[in-house]
């Protein structure tokens, strides 16, 4: 990856593949990764753009690349990319000397399909991150982190309720995803915001907030409908 930025010749190497099951957090991972590079200030100096491969097929690829010059282009559901678009993008990458980073996102099957569209295109994606299947404890840690980013804290009893919610959506043939956990948190936040009388009482008794002014999510907010 560092070679991609150090060479400054073109975007013919060091581009990234992020693969994993649907809803596993590929886009969140890619976005966080790009923010780190942008914060450093020396690698990515341009804008970040995200586009679905099916939508990219209908665009002027050169114009899309021009908009994110020196930044990053994330192509979601990369397996839907057309052969002609992959070839055009490969050509543009060979002549891109601005340090632009290109990221493909999809399941392993989708990535394999995308790379089969054009040999030159495939050769430019030399780095890969495979998003793992998360345990329930890891999903809860994600939920706590996601809540904190939004200004909330999950109390101890609510953590138990969250564990139950996650267990209840487990499937034998498919791992529980970060997207599903995110939806549970979003639902809890919505319930907290519309809890009426209980909310008014908690505000008056100062039980709604932590010492660092985060809103507390309680057990009731995680109960299934």
Feature-to-residue mapping (PLM):
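Pre-Walker A (pre-P-loop) alpha-helix and adjacent loop at the N terminus of AAA/AAA+ ATPase modules
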Residues: 1-14
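Walker A/P-loop
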Residues: 13-45
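Conserved nucleotide-binding/hydrolysis micro-motifs of P-loop NTPases
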Residues: 24, 55-57, 79-81, 107-112, ...
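AAA+/P-loop NTPase substrate/partner-engagement loops
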Residues: 36-68
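Conserved P-loop NTPase "ATPase switch" module shared by AAA+ and STAND
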Residues: 52-55, 65-85, 94
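Structural recognition of the conserved hydrophobic beta-strand(s) that form the central parallel beta-sheet
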Residues: 74-76, 100-108
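A short helix-turn-beta junction within AAA+ P-loop NTPase domains corresponding to the substrate/partner-engaging
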Residues: 116-133
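C-terminal alpha-helical "lid" subdomain
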Residues: 146-153, 160-225
């Amino acid at each position: 990856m560092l070679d991609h930025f150090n060479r400054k010749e073109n975007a013919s190497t060091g581009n990234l593949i992020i693969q994993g099951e649907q809803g596993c957090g590929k886009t969140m991972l890619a976005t966080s990764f790009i923010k780190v590079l942008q914060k450093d200030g020396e690698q990515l100096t341009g804008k970040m753009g995200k586009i679905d491969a099916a939508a990219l097929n209908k665009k002027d690829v050169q114009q899309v690349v021009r908009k994110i010059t020196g930044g990053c282009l994330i192509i979601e559901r990369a397996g839907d990319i057309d052969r002609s678009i992959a070839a055009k993008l490969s050509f543009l990458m060979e002549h891109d000397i601005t340090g632009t980073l290109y990221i493909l996102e999809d399941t392993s099957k989708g990535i394999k399909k995308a790379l089969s569209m054009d040999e030159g295109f495939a050769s430019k994606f030399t780095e890969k991150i495979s998003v793992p299947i998360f345990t329930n404890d890891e999903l809860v840690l994600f939920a706590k982190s996601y809540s904190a980013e939004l200004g909330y804290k999950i109390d101890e009893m609510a953590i138990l309720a969250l564990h139950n919610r996650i267990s209840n959506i487990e499937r034998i043939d498919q791992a529980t995803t970060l997207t599903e956990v995110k939806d549970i948190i979003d639902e809890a936040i919505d319930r907290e915001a519309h809890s009426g009388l209980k909310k008014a009482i908690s505000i008056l008794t100062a039980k709604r907030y932590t010492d660092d002014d985060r809103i507390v999510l309680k057990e009731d907010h995680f109960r299934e409908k």
